[in-house]
Amino acid sequence: ATVTESDIHCIRAKGKLSNLREKLAGGENLAQVGIGHTRWATHGKPEEYNAHPHMDMAMRVAVVQNGIVENYRELREELKVRGHEFRSDTDTEVIPHLIAEFLALPSSSSPLSPSPFLE
C-alpha cells in the first residue's frame, strides 16, 4: 500500500514478491510512503484476498502485522453488528476496522472511555 496526499493505493499479490513485482511493472506511482509485508498464512487460505495489507471499508487505514489477534472472531462479530464488512478471512483485518471505529469517535470522547473493543 502506498500513500499520496489524499489516497491509499493498495496492490496485493498471492505468493512470492516476484508476483507483486509483475503486477506493479509499468505502472506509475508518485507515492513517497508505503508499507508491505510477506507473511505465512495463519488464518484463511493463502489467496490474494487474504494477503496484506488489509484495509478498513473506507480504504483510509492500511495495516500489516506479523502476529496473531487471538480474539479476532469475537471482534469481527462485534464489528459486523456495527455494519463493518470484511473482505478476507484473516485475523489481521479486524485491526484497520478497529482503528476506523476509533477515528470515527467524536473528538470529545476520551480514548480511555469504556469500549467493547478494549479486551
Q: What would you call each of these model-derived segments?
A:
Residues 1-119:
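Conserved short alpha-helical segments that host acidic/polar catalytic motifs at enzyme active sites
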